[in-house]
Amino acid sequence: YRFAPGYETEDFDSVLDWAAWPGAAGGFQGAVEMCNNNGACRKLSGGVMCPSYRPTRNERDAVRGRANSLRLAMSGQLGPDAMASDAMAETMKLCVSCKACKRECPVGVDMARMKVEVTAARAAKHGIPLHDRLIGNLPAYAPLASGLSGLSNLVQSVWRHVPGLASLVSRLTGFT
């Protein structure tokens, strides 16, 4: 059995509309439960699925591994707020949202769409990281930044000579 006796999912407020997805639980939970562990996401040649699993060959980086992690989180087996946890973010980190899973999975699991839910749950609990806000607002400040290229070049040349400054800026902004 894929589910232990007494398996139930906890309520989850999704940000996307999952009404069209089948499954015993329906909605987002039903979409996650569509993964039947057939392992098509673990193929190493032919097709495109799953580009993050192929180099790592780590089950966590396969669509099936991510779906199983979501299933554990939804059923409360990973503790409270598991959808917004660091562990869940790490599980989803290498998903490149290419949607190869949706195209090539025999049951059409759409992990890119599920990643949106995890990202939204994490943002609701912890806020949006500075790195993501900087990238998201790039169009707003890009014209100003382009005018400050000389200052930027000066700062970059200085911080190479100040021990620890580059790593501090990297930790603060999330850029390496």
Regions found by a protein language model. Give the residues of each.
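Non-heme iron-sulfur electron-transfer modules
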Residues: Y1-T9, G46-A87, G108-R133
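Iron-sulfur-cluster electron-transfer modules
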Residues: G79-T176
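Flexible inter-domain linker/hinge segments
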Residues: Y1-P51, R57-D61, L70-M74, N153, ...
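Short Cys/His-rich local motifs and their 1-3 flanking residues in nucleic-acid-associated proteins
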Residues: N37-A40, S52-P55, S97-R103, V107
